[in-house]
């Protein structure tokens, strides 16, 4: 994978090794983003015409291009590891060995089954070993993996694996609570249910006390 940061390549390889990478076909050719957007816009034009929408209307005529730009540059930008966030690791000179938790990380993703919104929040915790990570980088890693067609279970495990790989420790935990619009806006149309997924590693899995400390943080209990 050319032109990737060392961190992005390490994370990608770890996900592939664990069978957690997003399903991607081998690229038939290397398309630049502008070509990709142009092709997507053409296909979206055909879809809208099949829905009998009038693309000569000034409200609709730019919609195929808007959708193409949104897909490539925004909501599916996490499919391209060139967009993996720049990671700042700091040597753990303070010998921090207690849980570090970031709560209420806002995430918006897209259900890969129906291409509609997943809207939720993540809580991420880790116990430092040799390094600590800049706190905003945790948010950015969550957002990177959310910017893909996803299932929530895989998203949770991808975030866990990425942080374990970067931090050099298994002691990482991730919990996501989200509303799926494929449930809320179609099908059963259940507007009140939410889905919670949790992925635990190291002490968060093996130690009941550590696991309970994390779960209390997820629930905002003191």
Curated annotation (Swiss-Prot):
InterPro entries cross-referenced by the UniProt entry: GTP-CH-I_C/QueF, GTP-CH-I_N, GTP_CycHdrlase_I, GTP_CycHdrlase_I_CS, GTP_CycHdrlase_I_dom
GO BP of this protein: one-carbon metabolic process; tetrahydrobiopterin biosynthetic process; tetrahydrofolate biosynthetic process
Reactions catalysed according to its record: GTP + H2O = 7,8-dihydroneopterin 3'-triphosphate + formate + H(+)
Positions that bind Zn(2+): 111, 114, 182
Gene this protein is translated from: folE
Species of the source: Salmonella gallinarum (strain 287/91 / NCTC 13346)
Protein name: GTP cyclohydrolase 1
A Pfam family this chain is assigned to: GTP_cyclohydroI
Pathway field: Cofactor biosynthesis; 7,8-dihydroneopterin triphosphate biosynthesis; 7,8-dihydroneopterin triphosphate from GTP: step 1/1
Gene3D superfamilies: 1.10.286.10, 3.30.1130.10
Keywords of this entry: GTP-binding, Hydrolase, Metal-binding, Nucleotide-binding, One-carbon metabolism, Zinc
Its EC number(s): 3.5.4.16
Quaternary structure annotation from Swiss-Prot or TrEMBL: Homomer.
Family as reported in the entry's similarity comment: Belongs to the GTP cyclohydrolase I family.
NCBIfam families per the UniProt record, alphabetical: folE, PRK09347.1-1, PRK09347.1-3
An example Gene Ontology molecular-function term: GTP cyclohydrolase I activity
A GO CC term attached to the entry: cytoplasm
């Amino acid at each position: 994978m050319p032109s990737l940061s060392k961190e992005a390549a390490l994370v990608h390889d770890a996900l592939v090794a664990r069978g957690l990478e997003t399903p991607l076909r081998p690229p038939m050719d290397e398309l630049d983003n502008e070509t990709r957007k142009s092709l997507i816009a053409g296909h979206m034009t055909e879809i809208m015409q099949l829905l009998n929408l009038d693309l000569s209307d000034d409200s609709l005529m730019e919609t195929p291009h808007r959708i193409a730009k949104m897909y490539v540059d925004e909501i599916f930008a996490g499919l391209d590891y060139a967009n993996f966030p720049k990671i700042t690791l700091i040597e753990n000179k303070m010998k921090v060995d207690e849980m570090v938790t970031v709560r209420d990380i806002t995430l918006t993703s897209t259900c890969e089954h129906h291409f509609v919104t997943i809207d939720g929040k993540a809580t991420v915790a880790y116990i430092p070993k040799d390094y600590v990570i800049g706190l905003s980088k945790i948010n950015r890693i969550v957002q990177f993996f959310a910017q893909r067609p996803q299932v929530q279970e895989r998203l949770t495990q991808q975030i866990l694996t990425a942080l374990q790989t970067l931090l050099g420790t298994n002691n990482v935990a991730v919990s996501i609570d989200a509303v799926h619009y494929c449930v809320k806006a179609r099908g059963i149309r259940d507007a009140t249910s939410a889905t919670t997924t949790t992925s635990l590693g190291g002490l968060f899995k093996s130690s009941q006390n550590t696991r309970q400390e994390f779960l209390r943080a997820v629930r905002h209990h003191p």
